[in-house]
Amino acid sequence: MTEAQTACATTETPVAAPAAPRWRVADVIALYELPFNDLLFRAQQTHREHFDANAIQLSTLLSIKTGGCEEDCGYCSQSAHHDTGLKAEKLMEVDAVLAAARTAKENGATRFCMGAAWRNPKDRHIEPIKEMIRGVKDMGLETCVTLGMLEEHQAKALAEAGLDYYNHNLDTSPEFYGQIISTRTYQDRLDTLERVRDAGINVCCGGIIGMGESRRERAGLIAQLANMNPYPESVPINNLVAIEGTPLENAQALDPFEFVRTIAVARITMPKAMVRLSAGREQLDDAMQALCFLAGANSMFYGDVLLTTGNPRAEADRKLLARLGMSASEASQLSA
């Protein structure tokens, strides 16, 4: 080797080793296994470092295109693969969506989410959805949409319309995923999330628990979310609603304390995220919902229906927050 070659060899930049995950599944399991009081104490401490512990964001979710979805998600009433009696409907008109958003704002919501039951939107769908986004934002509401998988140009178009958040859940851990859905891969979901992030839209990504997964698999979902770089700004945690006609209609109900533990673990591992109580709140009594707030949930979906499943009535939610001395926050950007 010549002197020049030797010099080149010795100054060559070494290849960096892959970054270690911030949270190993074993670490997340260890959080789950803490005594309940210790877990909630730690979660509440973490929560108070970044948020007003007595403020809850109220979100409303509207199904802007219902039923007839090509995917075979085992939990979903909107899948064309399942006989749930749900009638497929076309995309709602822009004016009807904006009217629903006005009602949501009048009822106290500060965030308006629009969901469409598609595998992926067609390009012809993007323009009316951009109109919906702009109209909702003009009302001073935060916007979120969930439309299925996105192409890069579609994500950019939504960003240009001013979309605040795009929701695309992982649903469960990579290991359990194949037992829930076969028509879309885990990597498909991660690819869409990357396109959303690259377009400059905040990521809303969480999952569903109570689908028959083990605690290890719940921990696997949380680890997957927490190890995203960065982790999602918004993390909805859904409690399975077992719907007649779906493959999971006979799923055993989850212990509500396990749901609260999941909220706490999400808060500890993703300290600055909005952790959102989503579907399945009807299965939690007021005391359990209060424990979820103590565990670090700082948003809840508000209104009588979430897409196609029931939800506690808005008046009951207002009364619960008043009993707890909590108030509705103006927006989700509460983190210090």
From Swiss-Prot:
Catalytic activities: (4R,5S)-dethiobiotin + (sulfur carrier)-SH + 2 reduced [2Fe-2S]-[ferredoxin] + 2 S-adenosyl-L-methionine = (sulfur carrier)-H + biotin + 2 5'-deoxyadenosine + 2 L-methionine + 2 oxidized [2Fe-2S]-[ferredoxin]
Residues annotated to bind [2Fe-2S] cluster: C113, C144, C204, R276
SUPFAM superfamilies (UniProt xref): Radical SAM enzymes
Binding annotation for [4Fe-4S] cluster: C69, C73, C76
A Pfam family: BATS
Domain of life according to the entry: Bacteria
GO BP term, pick one: biotin biosynthetic process
Ranges in coiled-coil conformation: none
GO MF annotation terms: 2 iron, 2 sulfur cluster binding; 4 iron, 4 sulfur cluster binding; biotin synthase activity; iron ion binding
EC main group: transferase
The protein's required cofactors: [4Fe-4S] cluster; [2Fe-2S] cluster
Assigned EC number: 2.8.1.6
Transmembrane stretches, start-end: none
Function: Catalyzes the conversion of dethiobiotin (DTB) to biotin by the insertion of a sulfur atom into dethiobiotin via a radical-based mechanism.
Family listed: Belongs to the radical SAM superfamily. Biotin synthase family.
Protein's name according to its UniProt entry: Biotin synthase
Organism for this UniProt entry: Burkholderia mallei (strain ATCC 23344)
Name of the gene encoding the protein in the UniProt record: bioB
